[in-house]
């Protein structure tokens, strides 16, 4: 039997967040160079934007403790999280002044931090657009390099 909930005009932040969980997404750890140090965070707003030119994007919350550093960044590295890397997802979502403590990384494109742990997909990007949208800013990036593995991506769904 199909169960349909009533339509609601009550689109509060909590309602929207809860109901958008019906839209399955992957999860990515995004890294960059902040103020002289690597920074990174877990996101599920990441998605493909354009094929020609090759653009991807994700949205950063204006309340992020590192918002100014992300706005100043010229690029970012997308690490798509594998199905068995829930710990990596949690690590980069947990508040910390240094999420890179104990994490192996090397300098990649433009010196940006690349996680050594293999992931299904890694994209090194240069920022092409910074587009404010409500309480988030959309960071569009041109894909410069693509690295893949056979690992299966993690899928978040309700
Ligand atoms: C599954 C998941 C998805 C998330 N997606 C986003 C996102 O798309 N954009 C964002 O700014 N924060 C997102 N967050 C929150 C960040 O990972 C982080 O916890 C939060 O921004 C606080 O850290 P910060 O102060 O370094 O930004 C997500 C967290 C989780 C667990």
What are these regions (language model features)?
Residues 1-158:
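Basic, polyanion-binding surface patches
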């Amino acid at each position: 039997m199909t169960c349909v909930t009533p339509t609601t005009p009550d689109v509060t932040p909590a309602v929207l967040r809860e109901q958008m969980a019906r839209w399955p997404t992957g999860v990515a750890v995004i890294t960059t160079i902040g103020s002289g140090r690597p920074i990174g965070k877990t996101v599920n707003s990441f998605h493909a934007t354009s094929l020609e030119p090759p653009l991807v994007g994700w949205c950063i919350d204006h309340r992020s403790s590192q918002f100014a550093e992300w706005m100043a960044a010229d690029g970012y590295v997308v690490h798509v999280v594998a199905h068995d890397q829930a710990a990596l997802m949690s690590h980069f979502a947990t508040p910390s002044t240094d999420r890179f403590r104990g994490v192996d990384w090397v300098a990649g494109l433009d010196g940006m931090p690349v996680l050594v742990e293999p992931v299904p997909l890694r994209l090194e990007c240069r920022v092409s657009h910074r587009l404010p949208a409500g309480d988030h800013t959309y960071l569009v990036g041109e894909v410069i390099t693509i690295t893949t593995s056979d690992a299966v991506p993690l899928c978040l769904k309700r």
